[in-house]
Amino acid sequence: MARNSRIRITNNDKALYAKLVKNTKAKISRTKKKYGIDLSNEIELPPLESFQTREEFNKWKQKQESFTNRANQNYQFVKNKYGIVASKAKINEIAKNTKEAQRIVDEQREEIEDKPFISGGKQQGTVGQRMQILSPSQVTGISRPSDFNFDDVRSYARLRTLEEGMAEKASPDYYDRRMTQMHQNFIEIVEKSFNSDWLSDELVERLKKIPPDDFFELYLMFDEISFEYFDSEGEDVEASEAMLNKIHSYLDRYERGDVNLDLKGF
């Protein structure tokens, strides 16, 4: 295997090195002065004589050129009216993830809006009509993120929350986890509301056998499958034996395949 020969420094190398170092230092100084961001640890400025090979020098040169390139949004910054500074890359990433999270929620709402809403065993309109009366987030338990506007960010803590939250919500896995958590929470609240009762014990066992995504659709479609009627402290339980029987009847329909569930793979 051929070894890289030791670099022979030319006058052109010296001129290019001096130019790159000057541009890099100017950018570091300008960014520090204008935005209060210290980039000195982001890039190395070794002595020209320290480069052992031409390949090593060329790699360093490429890093310097990328660092000072205005198209590199990782090192282009924006300061808003509250004095919060962020790179254009971070701002664009949050905006992109916000749009994707909104798209996922919008798609989900379109999938469920025509489903029947049933209360007391009778259809009382559709899930979409219920979302108009209440709000989509009240009905589904899932909020649609607001549009991202960097000018509205008042603190770095808020910026981090948006960055992490939108990255999470832009993933379909996030909504799968929400459905799983909702399913588990409902099972637990039924257990705690009645402690031990044969009707509720049987209901719990039946609920455990339902996949989380199926449960989510049942939760949307059947009024009695609601957190509002149960209390984990056992102090304000509105769910009656008749209501438990009604939920059992809904699960009978589900187990017979009489309930149209089509959010599979959402």
Swiss-Prot record:
Record site feature (Positions the 3' end of the template strand at the active site of the DNA polymerase), residues: 230
Chain positions covered by the region annotation Disordered: 1-73
Motif placement: Nuclear localization signal: 25-34
Q: Name one GO molecular function term.
A: hydrolase activity
Which residues get modified to O-(5'-phospho-DNA)-serine?
232
Q: Tell me where on the tree of life, at the top rank, the source sits.
A: Viruses
Where are the annotated segments for Intermediate? 74-172
Specify where the region named Interaction with the viral DNA polymerase lies, as residue ranges.
Answer: 256-258
Cellular component per GO?
host cell nucleus; virion component
Location within or outside the cell = Virion; Host nucleus
Q: Which UniProt keywords apply?
A: Covalent protein-DNA linkage, Degradation of host cell envelope components during virus entry, Degradation of host peptidoglycans during virus entry, DNA replication, Early protein, Host nucleus, Hydrolase, Phosphoprotein, Viral DNA replication, Virion, Virus entry into host cell
GO BP terms in the entry: DNA replication, synthesis of primer; symbiont entry into host cell via disruption of host cell envelope; symbiont entry into host cell via disruption of host cell wall peptidoglycan; viral DNA genome replication
InterPro entries associated with the record: DNA_terminal_Gp3, DNA_terminal_Gp3_C, DNA_terminal_Gp3_sf
Span list, region Priming: 173-266
Kindly state the subunit structure of this protein.
Interacts with the viral polymerase; this interaction allows the initiation of TP-primed DNA replication at both viral DNA ends. Binds to ssDNA. Interacts with the replication protein p1. Part of a DNA-gp3-gp16 complex.
**So what does this one do?**
Acts as a primer for DNA elongation during viral genomic replication. Acts as the small terminase protein during packaging. Recruits the phage DNA polymerase to the bacterial nucleoid. Primer terminal protein (TP) is covalently linked to the 5'-ends of both strands of the genome through a phosphodiester bond between the beta-hydroxyl group of a serine residue and the 5'-phosphate of the terminal deoxyadenylate (dAMP). Hydrolyzes host peptidoglycans during virus entry.
User: Of which family is this protein a member?
Assistant: Belongs to the phi29likevirus DNA terminal protein family.
Name the chain's protein: DNA terminal protein
Q: Which species?
A: Bacillus phage Nf
